[in-house]
A protein has these predicted regions:
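C-terminal regulatory domains involved in ligand/effector binding and gene-expression control
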Residues: 1-77, 164, 200-204
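Active-site beta-strand/loop microenvironment that shapes enzyme catalytic pockets
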Residues: 79-127
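Terminal alpha-helical anchor/extension segments at protein ends
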Residues: 114, 120-125, 140, 193-204
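Short glycine-/aliphatic-rich beta-strand segments at the starts of folded cytosolic domains
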Residues: 130-147, 173-175
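Short amphipathic alpha-helix segments
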Residues: 141-160
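Short amphipathic alpha-helices in soluble, non-transmembrane regions
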Residues: 151-157, 184-193
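N-terminal positively charged helical leader segments and presequences
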Residues: 167-169
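Terminal, non-globular segments
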Residues: 175, 181-182
Length: 204
Protein backbone atom coordinates (compact mmCIF):
# COMPACT_ATOMS: atom_id res chain seq x y z
CA UNK A 1 0.00 0.00 0.00
CA UNK A 2 1.27 3.47 -0.88
CA UNK A 3 -0.43 5.06 2.13
CA UNK A 4 -2.95 4.29 4.84
CA UNK A 5 -4.81 5.81 7.76
CA UNK A 6 -3.39 5.65 11.30
CA UNK A 7 -4.81 6.94 14.61
CA UNK A 8 -4.10 10.62 15.22
CA UNK A 9 -4.92 10.45 18.94
CA UNK A 10 -5.88 7.79 21.51
CA UNK A 11 -9.53 7.07 22.31
CA UNK A 12 -11.16 5.73 25.48
CA UNK A 13 -14.80 4.58 25.72
CA UNK A 14 -16.42 3.38 28.96
CA UNK A 15 -19.61 1.31 28.99
CA UNK A 16 -21.52 -0.63 31.66
CA UNK A 17 -23.30 -3.82 30.55
CA UNK A 18 -25.11 -6.00 33.12
CA UNK A 19 -23.03 -4.58 35.97
CA UNK A 20 -19.72 -5.28 34.18
CA UNK A 21 -17.68 -2.21 33.26
CA UNK A 22 -15.98 -2.32 29.86
CA UNK A 23 -13.24 0.21 29.09
CA UNK A 24 -12.16 0.27 25.43
CA UNK A 25 -8.86 1.93 24.58
CA UNK A 26 -7.47 2.55 21.09
CA UNK A 27 -3.94 3.77 20.37
CA UNK A 28 -1.45 4.21 17.54
CA UNK A 29 1.12 1.40 17.67
CA UNK A 30 3.75 1.18 14.92
CA UNK A 31 4.68 -2.51 14.94
CA UNK A 32 3.97 -5.56 17.08
CA UNK A 33 6.43 -4.59 19.83
CA UNK A 34 4.72 -1.22 20.22
CA UNK A 35 1.35 -3.00 20.36
CA UNK A 36 2.57 -5.32 23.12
CA UNK A 37 4.03 -2.37 25.05
CA UNK A 38 0.68 -0.55 24.90
CA UNK A 39 -1.14 -3.66 26.15
CA UNK A 40 1.27 -3.94 29.09
CA UNK A 41 0.79 -0.27 29.94
CA UNK A 42 -2.99 -0.78 30.07
CA UNK A 43 -2.55 -3.88 32.26
CA UNK A 44 -0.43 -1.79 34.63
CA UNK A 45 -3.11 0.92 34.77
CA UNK A 46 -5.89 -1.62 35.46
CA UNK A 47 -4.26 -4.39 37.53
CA UNK A 48 -7.52 -5.36 39.27
CA UNK A 49 -9.56 -5.93 36.09
CA UNK A 50 -10.77 -9.49 35.38
CA UNK A 51 -9.84 -9.41 31.67
CA UNK A 52 -7.64 -7.35 29.34
CA UNK A 53 -8.72 -8.49 25.86
CA UNK A 54 -6.64 -7.39 22.92
CA UNK A 55 -6.56 -7.00 19.14
CA UNK A 56 -4.11 -5.21 16.89
CA UNK A 57 -3.38 -4.37 13.28
CA UNK A 58 0.21 -3.34 13.95
CA UNK A 59 1.26 -2.56 10.38
CA UNK A 60 -0.49 -1.54 7.18
CA UNK A 61 -4.19 -2.56 7.09
CA UNK A 62 -3.44 -5.30 4.53
CA UNK A 63 -0.35 -6.70 6.32
CA UNK A 64 -1.57 -10.05 7.67
CA UNK A 65 1.84 -10.68 9.28
CA UNK A 66 1.17 -7.98 11.90
CA UNK A 67 -2.27 -9.01 13.17
CA UNK A 68 -2.84 -10.28 16.70
CA UNK A 69 -5.58 -10.88 19.28
CA UNK A 70 -6.20 -12.45 22.68
CA UNK A 71 -9.34 -13.45 24.59
CA UNK A 72 -7.41 -13.24 27.90
CA UNK A 73 -9.51 -15.85 29.69
CA UNK A 74 -12.88 -15.08 28.09
CA UNK A 75 -14.48 -18.00 26.17
CA UNK A 76 -12.59 -18.62 22.91
CA UNK A 77 -13.72 -16.41 20.06
CA UNK A 78 -15.86 -14.06 22.17
CA UNK A 79 -13.45 -11.15 22.60
CA UNK A 80 -10.23 -10.90 20.58
CA UNK A 81 -11.71 -12.08 17.27
CA UNK A 82 -14.71 -9.71 17.21
CA UNK A 83 -12.38 -6.90 18.27
CA UNK A 84 -9.95 -7.71 15.44
CA UNK A 85 -12.84 -7.92 12.96
CA UNK A 86 -13.83 -4.35 13.86
CA UNK A 87 -10.25 -3.10 13.44
CA UNK A 88 -9.81 -4.84 10.08
CA UNK A 89 -13.13 -3.48 8.85
CA UNK A 90 -12.08 0.08 9.70
CA UNK A 91 -9.26 0.25 7.15
CA UNK A 92 -7.01 1.83 9.80
CA UNK A 93 -3.46 0.53 10.32
CA UNK A 94 -0.94 0.67 13.16
CA UNK A 95 -3.73 0.45 15.74
CA UNK A 96 -4.23 -1.56 18.93
CA UNK A 97 -7.46 -2.05 20.88
CA UNK A 98 -7.57 -3.17 24.51
CA UNK A 99 -10.90 -3.79 26.24
CA UNK A 100 -10.62 -3.92 30.02
CA UNK A 101 -13.46 -5.73 31.82
CA UNK A 102 -14.30 -5.30 35.46
CA UNK A 103 -16.64 -8.22 36.17
CA UNK A 104 -19.93 -7.27 37.81
CA UNK A 105 -21.20 -10.70 38.81
CA UNK A 106 -23.64 -11.36 35.92
CA UNK A 107 -22.81 -13.66 33.01
CA UNK A 108 -23.32 -12.18 29.55
CA UNK A 109 -23.28 -15.41 27.54
CA UNK A 110 -21.32 -15.97 24.34
CA UNK A 111 -23.44 -13.66 22.18
CA UNK A 112 -23.43 -10.97 24.83
CA UNK A 113 -19.64 -11.06 25.11
CA UNK A 114 -19.14 -10.84 21.34
CA UNK A 115 -21.49 -7.85 21.25
CA UNK A 116 -19.82 -6.17 24.24
CA UNK A 117 -16.23 -6.53 23.01
CA UNK A 118 -16.89 -5.93 19.32
CA UNK A 119 -19.35 -3.16 20.11
CA UNK A 120 -16.90 -1.37 22.38
CA UNK A 121 -14.27 -1.25 19.65
CA UNK A 122 -16.90 -0.14 17.12
CA UNK A 123 -17.92 2.75 19.38
CA UNK A 124 -14.31 3.78 19.91
CA UNK A 125 -13.57 3.64 16.17
CA UNK A 126 -16.48 6.02 15.52
CA UNK A 127 -14.76 8.56 17.80
CA UNK A 128 -11.30 7.99 16.33
CA UNK A 129 -9.53 10.78 14.44
CA UNK A 130 -7.05 9.62 11.80
CA UNK A 131 -4.21 10.91 9.69
CA UNK A 132 -2.68 9.51 6.51
CA UNK A 133 0.73 7.83 6.61
CA UNK A 134 2.87 7.51 3.50
CA UNK A 135 5.83 5.20 4.12
CA UNK A 136 9.18 6.42 2.79
CA UNK A 137 12.03 4.43 1.24
CA UNK A 138 15.59 5.55 1.95
CA UNK A 139 18.39 6.00 -0.60
CA UNK A 140 21.90 7.46 -0.69
CA UNK A 141 22.91 10.23 -3.06
CA UNK A 142 26.35 11.76 -3.58
CA UNK A 143 26.53 15.33 -4.89
CA UNK A 144 28.65 18.47 -5.08
CA UNK A 145 28.14 21.27 -2.55
CA UNK A 146 26.90 23.50 -5.37
CA UNK A 147 24.12 21.00 -6.18
CA UNK A 148 22.72 20.72 -2.66
CA UNK A 149 20.17 23.54 -2.83
CA UNK A 150 18.80 22.23 -6.12
CA UNK A 151 18.47 18.70 -4.74
CA UNK A 152 16.63 19.99 -1.67
CA UNK A 153 14.16 21.75 -3.99
CA UNK A 154 13.62 18.57 -6.05
CA UNK A 155 13.00 16.54 -2.90
CA UNK A 156 10.42 19.09 -1.77
CA UNK A 157 8.60 18.76 -5.10
CA UNK A 158 8.42 14.97 -4.64
CA UNK A 159 7.40 14.84 -0.94
CA UNK A 160 10.88 13.64 0.00
CA UNK A 161 13.32 14.74 2.68
CA UNK A 162 16.96 14.56 3.71
CA UNK A 163 17.53 12.16 6.62
CA UNK A 164 21.25 12.70 7.04
CA UNK A 165 24.08 14.73 5.46
CA UNK A 166 27.79 13.84 5.55
CA UNK A 167 30.00 16.71 4.40
CA UNK A 168 33.38 15.63 3.01
CA UNK A 169 35.07 16.60 -0.27
CA UNK A 170 31.55 16.01 -1.59
CA UNK A 171 28.17 15.72 0.16
CA UNK A 172 26.81 12.24 0.91
CA UNK A 173 23.07 12.43 1.50
CA UNK A 174 20.65 9.90 2.93
CA UNK A 175 17.26 10.79 1.49
CA UNK A 176 13.75 9.35 1.89
CA UNK A 177 10.97 9.33 -0.71
CA UNK A 178 7.48 7.85 -1.09
CA UNK A 179 7.68 4.80 -3.36
CA UNK A 180 5.25 6.41 -5.81
CA UNK A 181 7.56 9.42 -6.25
CA UNK A 182 10.91 7.69 -6.79
CA UNK A 183 10.67 7.52 -10.59
CA UNK A 184 9.61 11.18 -10.80
CA UNK A 185 12.46 12.30 -8.54
CA UNK A 186 15.00 10.19 -10.46
CA UNK A 187 13.91 11.78 -13.74
CA UNK A 188 14.12 15.30 -12.27
CA UNK A 189 17.53 14.48 -10.77
CA UNK A 190 18.84 13.26 -14.13
CA UNK A 191 17.66 16.47 -15.82
CA UNK A 192 19.09 18.66 -13.06
CA UNK A 193 22.52 16.97 -13.07
CA UNK A 194 22.64 16.13 -16.80
CA UNK A 195 22.78 12.47 -15.87
CA UNK A 196 25.68 12.68 -13.41
CA UNK A 197 23.67 11.98 -10.23
CA UNK A 198 21.59 8.95 -9.30
CA UNK A 199 19.86 7.44 -6.29
CA UNK A 200 21.47 4.35 -4.80
CA UNK A 201 19.33 1.84 -2.95
CA UNK A 202 20.42 1.06 0.61
CA UNK A 203 21.17 -2.63 1.05
CA UNK A 204 19.69 -4.14 4.22
Amino acid sequence: MESWLIPAAPVTVVEEIKKSRFITLLAHTDGVEAAKAFVESVRAEHPDARHHCVAWVAGAPDDSQQLGFSDDGEPAGTAGKPMLAQLMGSGVGEITAVVVRYYGGMLLGTGGLVKAYGGGVNQALRQLTTQRKTPLTEYTLQCEYSQLTGIEALLGQCDGKIINSDYQAFVLLRVALPAAKVAEFSAKLADFSRGSLQLLAIEE
